[in-house]
């Protein structure tokens, strides 16, 4: 009886942690996901720029620049991603300008629409950003 109660408590506790960490919106977990998104966006900029050095052009999509080694961390997955109608895979929003000379990169935020007030952007300094093709606004 006591063992069964312990197992039940463990299942409930881990289930609650999983729910609050993965699905609940609002509160401290959203803030943590937003902070992680900024860190990952900053890493993604570096990976995109490295891709350009190797291939002489920006990747057409983030999938094209993903690490080939599956053991390597993928910086293009948005930790704040919420499934929206019409969205596909949980990656950051990425768009290369038709000229191929610059790109837009961001987390689209809770509304799922790019270039709105809830978007999360990379936090590069002006000096860091001027050496990249990253544009923050259209």
Task: Set out the residue ranges of the language-model regions.
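Low-complexity, acidic interaction segments enriched in glycine
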Residues: 35-138
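Amphipathic alpha-helical segments typified by the pilin-like N-terminal helix
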Residues: 1-39
